[in-house]
Swiss-Prot record:
This is Stabilizer of axonemal microtubules 4. Transmembrane segments: none annotated. One of its GO terms (molecular function) is phosphatase binding. GO terms for biological process: flagellated sperm motility.
Amino acid sequence: MMGKLPLGVVSPYVKMSSGGYTDPLKFYATSYCTAYGREDFKPRVGSHVGTGYKSNFQPVVSCQASLEALDNPARGEQAQDHFQSVASQSYRPLEVPDGKHPLPWSMRQTSSGYGREKPSAGPPTKEVRKVHFDTQEHGPQAITGLEPREVPLLHQQQGQDPLERENFRHGPRFMTSEYNSKYLRDPLDQPDFLQKKSIGAKEGSGFTKQSHQSPIVFQPPSQALPGDPALLPGQSVTKSDFLPKTHLHGDEFLPVLARGSKRETAFSRGNERILNPRVPPPCPEPSSVSHQQFQPLHRMQQTNVALLGRETVGKKEPTGFSLNNPMYVRSPCDPDRDQRYLTTYNQGYFENIPKGLDQEGWTRGGIQPQMPGGYALSQPVSCMEATPNPMESLRHLHPHVGRTLTSADPFYQNTPHSSRCVAHS
């Protein structure tokens, strides 16, 4: 059983109230609307006095000529131009000269930005002389860049119309194309013997006729040193130096560190002796005949140890590139993984990507509970609320507001299917 609704104490503003609204659209009834509100209220139309800036102005009594016309006409004439705004003085209507203004004292006055103060509408003489030259006054050599009276043909302005430029600017020919009239010549019907033309034997051009044999490139095989390749004119140096790519067969010699080279580098550029005697020593290309007389020996003299056969080659040692490298350490993140190429970056910054079953993520073991993300932290938990009870809502409202709602809407107090719900006739 629901208890009786509290009616409350009658307050002064309830006595002054004109009652609740009968309009069901006015759902929210406030104390101000019930006490002072009137239906069809229309505000009075007033006059616009001014903005808030006007209150800071000093009271100024303007003196106009119409007010002083009867009492003091002389005072009105004196105060006629005193109260005039700066905008009305500066921005006046356009005044066109009627010819009654006096002529200026000097025709070369400096013109201002206003059109009414210009003495004449024509361009000044100084601007005219910059464009039109007077040769009688200055002479052809007085001004640099003075154009002659007749412009050369190449300097004349020519039209870009292709129809005008055809046939040497005589217009296009009849039944001919633009390309044919410009770039193709008409074939002559006369035979060649009438033109007195003769075709001789084919000769070499200027690139090969005046060329001489180069002593740097040409080297007869008889003058070549033993071990040096013979450079013939017909043999290309590019083809001999840049050979095609060949695949290894397995019988090549292993690379070893040359004796006499520096240990801190991996290059054998400073090699003075070649361990393999079967490989011919490299010799530079002779630049000239006179230069060959002062060249050193191409082959190094063998020492006594080499002649006795006591020169041995030691075991292979690491070069300068691998001396400073750390030892090969298998990565602790995945010891079973075969890391053939281990770099410093892979050793320090290993991959943090899960492998195997760990790579499945949330799908492993079924659907996992959703974790709160950054977007869902500030969102409240949404749930299905129960149907609002009108009686419970009326108990928490003001008594006057509750009576206003029940008088305006008789279906608000009880549910529609209740026996107590009786519509007012």
